Amino acid sequence: MPTINQLIRKERAKVSKRRKTPALQACPQRRGVCTRVYTTTPKKPNSALRKVARVRLTNGIEVTSYIPGEGHNLQEHSVVMIRGGRVKDLPGVRYHIIRGTLDTSGVSDRRQSRSKYGAKRPK
């Protein structure tokens, strides 16, 4: 336990908070190129084939990001925009691909939560 004089001489070291999305480097979104598009299985107790992509960002960092929504048009060399946001049942997936921007198409026949999936308003 330090004395008050010791604290005046040298203050306590600040404990820095761990960043949840370090690859974004404090930006809201980042652009990148898909290097691999594949499916993976979630951890227990869930069961599915989740669509994910390995993305090399413009800052040179390569991350795994989730492709939300039903169906997608992504393949290798597709240019995508990613945002933060993890997928709880996929270890190591801390980013989401934004639908409806750059090479990523919006989800077709989407009626609700359209803005989150880049879907236009149905006529």
From Swiss-Prot:
| Protein name in UniProt | Small ribosomal subunit protein uS12
User: Which keywords annotate this record?
Assistant: Methylation, Ribonucleoprotein, Ribosomal protein, RNA-binding, rRNA-binding, tRNA-binding
Which InterPro entries does the UniProt entry name for this protein? NA-bd_OB-fold, Ribosomal_uS12, Ribosomal_uS12_bac
User: Region (Disordered): which ranges?
Assistant: 101-123
User: Which proteins does it associate with, and in what oligomeric form?
Assistant: Part of the 30S ribosomal subunit. Contacts proteins S8 and S17. May interact with IF1 in the 30S initiation complex.
Family in the record: Belongs to the universal ribosomal protein uS12 family.
Q: Which PANTHER family match?
A: 30S RIBOSOMAL PROTEIN S12 FAMILY MEMBER
The keyword Ribonucleoprotein is annotated on this UniProt entry? yes
Q: Which GO terms describe its molecular function?
A: rRNA binding; structural constituent of ribosome; tRNA binding
Stored Pfam families: Ribosom_S12_S23
Basic residues bias (residue ranges)? 113-123
Query: What's an example GO cellular component term for this entry?
Result: small ribosomal subunit
**List of residues that carry 3-methylthioaspartic acid:** D89
Read off the Gene3D superfamilies from this record.
Nucleic acid-binding proteins
Classification via NCBIfam families: rpsL_bact
What is this protein's function?
Answer: With S4 and S5 plays an important role in translational accuracy.
Q: Which GO terms describe its biological process?
A: translation
